[in-house]
Amino acid sequence: WEGAKVAKGRDRWAAVVREASKQSVRPWLPDVLDLVTTKQLARLASTDQAEGVRMLVLEPTAATPLSALDFDRRDLVLVVGPEGGITPQELDALSAAGADIVRLGDEVLRTSTAGPAALGAAHLHSGTGGARRARRRARPLVMRETLSWYP
């Protein structure tokens, strides 16, 4: 994305986050930040891993299913690629930086639904159930050209 399309996409995601937060009765509104490159995202993965944050990259061909991970209540960074997938080079860079490459299940979901489905699955498997927690440092939900901060 370039130029006006960046601002339009960011505004769209900000509206989605705002409405989803209202609907789920969140006590705070996550931030929607600027786009990042794969290189910047890999740096974020490396930094986050050092800080005890886990980055998950959804990839339909990954050997490890999301449900097989041990969720230890760390903050998560979730990366969802575009329709057509994340390139092998991007997967290699993110994996080398410490990200876990996982698949959501046997079915391939659209980009717009894969992120929310993965967040719900991660929430379920983390053992937090429906418990509400105090605001923690916001972490990004990444959809290739879009970076939205999410807890």
Residue ranges and their predicted role:
Residues 1-56:
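RNA substrate-binding interface of SAM-dependent RNA methyltransferases
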Residues 2, 33, 58, 83, ...:
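Glycine- and other small-residue-rich loops at beta-strand/loop junctions that grip anionic moieties
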Residues 5, 70-73, 92-94, 117:
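Short, glycine/charged-enriched secondary-structure capping and boundary segments
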Residues 36-43, 63-65, 108-109:
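A short acidic, often aromatic-flanked loop/helix-cap motif at beta-alpha or helix-coil junctions
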Residues 55-91, 100-102:
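Active-site/ligand-binding-proximal alpha/beta "capping" segment
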Residues 88-150:
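Structured adenosyl-cofactor binding patch, chiefly the S-adenosyl-L-methionine
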